[in-house]
Amino acid sequence: MRKNKDLWVDWLTKYETETQNMRLGENYSLAESLFETLNDISAETRGAREIRPTDRSITGLLKVAPDQPQIPFESSLERDFAILMTGRRGVFSIEAQPVTIRYLDDLGKERTYTPDFLITRYRHELEQPESGLHTMLVEIKYTSDLNGKNQPTLLQKFKHAKQWAEFKGWSFSVFTEKEIRTSELERTRELLPYRFLESETPIERAVYLFVRRHKVTTIRKIADALHNFSAEQVHTEVLKMLATHQLF
């Protein structure tokens, strides 16, 4: 008899989640040396805090960019997932509770299931040969919920969601706190406020050309090289460019 915690390991949606996270997470590798200086330069922007169990049931609206609609969420984990996706290069849109799927359970009774998110992203960012967009239905669940008393019901819901998604040419994945609450999330959370700043075009171009020439560098080195601008201006512009994927 397999233990509960092992049931999900080989399940396709979990496997897809882990491999997709690993592949998409590589987008941060080149930017890492730039971002490591953030704690020293702008520690006051840190908004991360420890998530307590009582935060599970919070609801609200998340604004991730000035030109995009707010994203509704019904738990802190859903909010964190939306933030995580915001930081991933190639993500085109994040839609909450996009569709309700109807299906028959084992007893022939009609049931409904509404996944938490629909993520659309460019295929080339996933290193896939096909051009165009890739669409993924997503369910957000705590690991304890996956392995709890409702596990059989969840498995049935997810099975039908996966079949429905494949019929549409989409995919379906389950994300837990293990995939969401990572160092990647903390970096994205800290960069989020910079997405709302106006760009300083001369600084932006100078930063872009410097990074393009030197490939891997640090914010401090960029600021030292671009002596026509103040260090504060350069720091802010670099962080904004990281937040909006203009660098790496």
Could you say what each language-model-derived stretch is?
Residues 1-248:
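Electrostatic, structured charged patches in enzyme active sites and in nucleic-acid/phosphate-binding
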